[in-house]
Amino acid sequence: LPDSSFLRL
């Protein structure tokens, strides 16, 4: 999911 991308911060 693209939303999970913010968790990479």
Swiss-Prot record:
One of its GO terms (cellular component) is extracellular region. One of its GO terms (biological process) is neuropeptide signaling pathway. The modification Leucine amide is found at L9. Keywords: Amidation, Neuropeptide, Secreted. It is found in: Secreted. It comes from the Eukaryota. Belongs to the FARP (FMRF amide related peptide) family. FMRFamides and FMRFamide-like peptides are neuropeptides. This is Extended FMRFamide-3. It comes from Lobatophasma redelinghuysense (Gladiator).
